[in-house]
Amino acid sequence: RVCPRILMECKKDSDCLAECVCLEHGYCG
């Protein structure tokens, strides 16, 4: 999957860019 390497806080997958998902530590990855 395509996920820009930008540190972004999130609560759910839709908070993240491209195909990133929200990981357990609260950041996109």
UniProtKB/Swiss-Prot annotation:
GO terms for cellular component: extracellular region. It is found in: Secreted. The keyword Chaperone does not apply. Keywords: Disulfide bond, Knottin, Protease inhibitor, Secreted, Serine protease inhibitor. Disulfide bonds join 3-20, 10-22, 16-28. Belongs to the protease inhibitor I7 (squash-type serine protease inhibitor) family. Inhibits trypsin. The presence of a 'disulfide through disulfide knot' structurally defines this protein as a knottin. This is Trypsin inhibitor 1. The lineage of its organism: Eukaryota, Viridiplantae, Streptophyta, Embryophyta, Tracheophyta.
